Amino acid sequence: MALARPRPRLGDLIEISRFGYAHWAIYVGDGYVVHLAPASEIAGAGAASVLSALTNKAIVKKELLSVVAGGDNYRVNNKHDDRYTPLPSNKIVKRAEELVGQELPYSLTSDNCEHFVNHLRYGVSRSDQVTGAVTTVGVAAGLLAAASLVGILLARSKRERQ
């Protein structure tokens, strides 16, 4: 038995699980979402595919959620409602619809699909995926530096004992 899909409401953020990342869209009614799709997107590759790293432009598209999600799982995820006050749903939808067809700047780190939908819903452009990736890189760099320092100190100690 298949799991029931969530029933989004106007202006809801939709998180679509892709392999290794999430694609984001905003629900605008009648089964449709508005989302930012990199211009390099290949049909069937999924929005914000790995190829999105190669482009600096994206198109705002209005498509059926079922088409954008394909076989991937999705969920309503208004994750910042406790931090930011969402704009009225009619305003979110109006703003999203007005952008359909426009080409916008795109960057994985500063202007991606998550930034886009958060700006529409909250008026705040942010991406937790980017923040998480930067934190992970920072922690990894810190661990590498610490390991290097320990290695240097151990080598120095060994030389001094000889």
UniProtKB/Swiss-Prot annotation:
pH dependence comment: Optimum pH is 8.
Major location category of this protein: cytoplasm
Domain LRAT, residue spans: 13-129
GO molecular function, one term: acyltransferase activity
Ranges that cross the membrane: 134-154
InterPro entries: H-rev107_PLA/AT, LRAT_dom
Lumenal side: 155-162
GO terms classed as biological process: lipid catabolic process; N-acylphosphatidylethanolamine metabolic process; phosphatidylethanolamine acyl-chain remodeling
Entry annotated with the keyword DNA damage: no
The reaction(s) this protein catalyses: a 1,2-diacyl-sn-glycero-3-phosphocholine + H2O = a 1-acyl-sn-glycero-3-phosphocholine + a fatty acid + H(+); a 1,2-diacyl-sn-glycero-3-phosphocholine + H2O = a 2-acyl-sn-glycero-3-phosphocholine + a fatty acid + H(+); a 1,2-diacyl-sn-glycero-3-phosphoethanolamine + a 1,2-diacyl-sn-glycero-3-phosphocholine = an N-acyl-1,2-diacyl-sn-glycero-3-phosphoethanolamine + a 1-acyl-sn-glycero-3-phosphocholine + H(+); a 1,2-diacyl-sn-glycero-3-phosphoethanolamine + a 1,2-diacyl-sn-glycero-3-phosphocholine = an N-acyl-1,2-diacyl-sn-glycero-3-phosphoethanolamine + a 2-acyl-sn-glycero-3-phosphocholine + H(+)
Keyword terms, alphabetized: Acyltransferase, Cytoplasm, Hydrolase, Lipid degradation, Lipid metabolism, Membrane, Transferase, Transmembrane, Transmembrane helix
Cytoplasmic topological intervals: 1-133
Subcellular location: Cytoplasm; Membrane
EC identifiers of the protein: 2.3.1.-, 3.1.1.32, 3.1.1.4
Tissue distribution of the protein: Expressed in liver, kidney, small intestine testis and colon. Undetectable in testis, placenta, salivary gland and fetal brain.
GO cellular component terms, A-Z: cytoplasm; cytosol; membrane
Signal peptide feature range: none
Active-site residues per Swiss-Prot or TrEMBL entry: 23, 35, 113
The keyword Acyltransferase is annotated on this UniProt entry: yes
Membrane topology note: Single-pass membrane protein
Family recorded in the similarity comment: Belongs to the H-rev107 family.
Role according to the record: Exhibits both phospholipase A1/2 and acyltransferase activities. Shows phospholipase A1 (PLA1) and A2 (PLA2) activity, catalyzing the calcium-independent release of fatty acids from the sn-1 or sn-2 position of glycerophospholipids. For most substrates, PLA1 activity is much higher than PLA2 activity. Shows O-acyltransferase activity, catalyzing the transfer of a fatty acyl group from glycerophospholipid to the hydroxyl group of lysophospholipid.
Protein's name according to its UniProt entry: Phospholipase A and acyltransferase 2
